[in-house]
């Protein structure tokens, strides 16, 4: 019976400790517009890549550091940024749970043709052309640039792990729409032969 009570107490201690990454119990601090890289965009313009970083300020981080979550916005590789839609919410929600979080911008844009896509919507009986077309290769290039920039953000954060108290062996990527594709490519595309 004594062994059973000890096992139950140990199990309860593990459950209580596991709540650290679940409950939104921490106060947070956020630093905006940190430059994590300088790049050339699709049109040859030089750009600075920015990120927002958020972390708990009243926690006791593990000796190895906090888990890191990188949030990547969507927008069809043409629009969006680190301050819109879901990434700001993910940034604060996960920091309140004990994570160090970052929301990143990545290079947007691609060359478009003059051809238009008919969206099967008619205005007063006339088909409406709602989008300009891009060559498929432009979508691949936009996707690849996004992945390169996300990997740059990841390198920046790992190189600053001590400063932001990050565990470089405990990293998560999350994205919406195009950001989801960028997150997947960042995690899994690691061989040059896999380049689209």
PLM ranges: what are they?
Residues 119-162:
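Alpha/beta-hydrolase active-site loop
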Residues 1-22:
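Bacterial Sec-dependent N-terminal signal peptides
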Residues 76, 108-110:
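Alpha/beta-hydrolase active-site loop signature
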């Amino acid at each position: 019976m004594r062994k059973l009570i000890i096992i139950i107490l140990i199990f309860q201690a593990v459950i209580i400790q596991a709540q650290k990454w679940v409950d939104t119990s921490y106060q947070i601090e956020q630093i905006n517009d940190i430059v994590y890289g300088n790049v050339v965009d699709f049109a040859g313009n030089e750009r600075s890549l920015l990120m927002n970083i958020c972390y708990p300020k009243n926690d006791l981080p593990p000796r190895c550091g906090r888990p890191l979550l990188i949030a990547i916005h969507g927008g069809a590789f043409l629009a969006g940024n680190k301050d819109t839609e879901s990434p700001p919410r993910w940034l604060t929600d996960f920091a309140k749970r004990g994570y160090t979080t970052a929301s990143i911008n990545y290079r947007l844009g691609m060359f478009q043709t003059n051809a238009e896509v008919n969206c099967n919507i008619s205005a007063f009986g006339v088909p409406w052309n709602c989008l300009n077309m891009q060559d498929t290769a432009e979508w691949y290039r936009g996707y690849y640039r996004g992945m390169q920039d996300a990997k740059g953000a990841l390198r920046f954060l790992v190189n600053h792990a001590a400063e932001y108290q990050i565990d470089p062996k405990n990293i998560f990527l999350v994205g919406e729409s195009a950001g989801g594709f960028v997150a997947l490519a960042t995690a899994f595309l690691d061989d040059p032969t896999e380049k689209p």
